[in-house]
Amino acid sequence: MADLTLCAFLTKVLCAHGGRMFLQDLRGHVELSEAKLRAVLRRAGPERFLLQEVELRDGPWDAEAEVAAGEGAGAGSGGGATACRVMAVSSARLCARYQRGECQGCDQLHLCRRHMLGKCPHRDCWSTCSLSHDIHTPINVQVLKSRGLFGLNEGQLRILLLQNDPCLFPEVCQMYNKGVDVLYGYCSLKDRCNKFHVCKSFVRGECPFQPCKRSHQLIHAATLKLLEDQELSVSSVVNFQIISVYRHKKLHKMLEEKDHSASTEQPQGLGKQGALGAVEARPFLPARAQSPRKPQ
C-alpha cells in the first residue's frame, strides 16, 4: 500500500475513533510492524499526524490531565509507563467567505458551518439551507482529494475539522482580547460571560508571544462548563488544544530562528565590507549650503 493511500486510511481510522489513538491500537488496523507504522507516520510529518509520548494514567478520563500530557507535562514525569499517541492533523478548512455567500470556488471546503457543528436549523430539510450540507459536491471532492481525505465520511470529516479548524471553535470573547487587564480585558461580564476567554490569535495559530498575557488554556473549569452548556465536544476541544500548543511552539521557534538569523547576518555583512564598505552603504547626503553672512 502506497504511503498516500495508507495515510488516507490511517486518518480515516483515527477520525473514526475520536481523532486520536495510541500507536499500538492504531497498529491493530494495519498489517505493519510498530516500527514500520511509526516510520510511515513520521514521513507524513506533523502536518498530517502528531506523535507524542504520553504517560499512561489510571482512573477515569480527565480532560485537563489529557491536555497536560499532550503538552509534554506528563511524558515520563511520574516515572510510569508511556505510550505513543497519534493525532490526526489537517490543513483542510471551511471557507469563511462561502459562509457569507461571497465565494463560488476555492481550495477550501464549501460546507455549512452550523451543519458541521450539528446545529443547522435546516438539518432535517437541508435543501432549504442556502449553504451546502454535501461533502461530495465537485468543489468539496476536489479539496478532499488534494488533501488525501477523500475516503472520509461526513462524521469522520467533522471530527477532523473540529480539532483543526478555528472556524469551528466556540466563539471567543473579543472584549477579553482588548485592554490591559490580564484577567478580563475589557469584558464587563467577567465570570458571567458566555464566550471563551482565550487568546484569539492562539486559536488561529498566529500568536507570536511566549509567554502571552492572554490565556492559551482552552480546557479548565470555566470552559468545561461553557462546553457543557453549549453541548460541544470536550474531546474535540482537548484535541484542538493539543494541536494548537504544538503549532504555537512551532511558530515561536520559527520566529526565534528568524530573529537569530537577522541578528547574526548584520554583523557578518559589516565585517566583510570593512569600514569603507560600511561608509559606502550609507545613502549620500549633500552638505547643507551655508548662507552668506551679512557684513558687520
Swiss-Prot record:
Zinc finger (C3H1-type): 111-136, 198-219
InterPro entries (alphabetical): WH-like_DNA-bd_sf, ZAP_HTH, Zc3hav1-like, Znf_CCCH
Pfam families tied to this protein: HTH_53, zf-CCCH_PARP12
Gene3D superfamilies attached to this UniProt entry: Winged helix-like DNA-binding domain superfamily/Winged helix DNA-binding domain
PROSITE patterns: ZF_C3H1
Keyword annotations of the record: Acetylation, Metal-binding, Repeat, Zinc, Zinc-finger
Residues modified to N-acetylalanine: A2
Recorded GO CC terms: cytosol
One function term, GO molecular function aspect: zinc ion binding
Protein name: Zinc finger CCCH-type antiviral protein 1-like
Source organism of the structure: Mus musculus
Gene: Zc3hav1l
